Amino acid sequence: LDPKCTLPLETGICRAELHRFGYDTKLKECTQFVYGGCHHNENNFKKLEVCR
């Protein structure tokens, strides 16, 4: 498992509603979440295929 995938899913503090994907360590799979548009970590992908 890539270390960046163990980072928490961060929605960010801004108010955009962008659909992104990140690895959820509890579910052990990539899931979709709403990203606010700023302040994120590396566990934030535009496409599901890139998250895997």
UniProtKB/Swiss-Prot annotation:
Origin: domain of life: Eukaryota
GO molecular function, one term: serine-type endopeptidase inhibitor activity
Coiled coil: none
Lineage, highest ranks first: Eukaryota, Metazoa, Ecdysozoa, Arthropoda, Hexapoda
A GO CC term attached to the entry: extracellular space
Positions of the BPTI/Kunitz inhibitor domain: 5-52
InterPro entries (alphabetical): Kunitz_BPTI, Kunitz_BPTI_sf, Prtase_inh_Kunz-CS, TFPI/VKTCI-like
Induction: By infection.
PROSITE patterns: BPTI_KUNITZ_1 (PS00280), BPTI_KUNITZ_2 (PS50279)
Described function: Inhibits trypsin and the toxin protease PR2 of M.anisopliae. Does not inhibit chymotrypsin, subtilisin Carlsberg, proteinase K, porcine pancreatic elastase and the toxin protease PR1 of M.anisopliae.
Protein name: Inducible serine protease inhibitor 2
Keywords recorded for this protein, A-Z: Disulfide bond, Protease inhibitor, Serine protease inhibitor
Site (Reactive bond): 15-16
Gene3D superfamilies according to UniProt: Pancreatic trypsin inhibitor Kunitz domain
Cysteine pairings via disulfide bonds: 14-38, 30-51
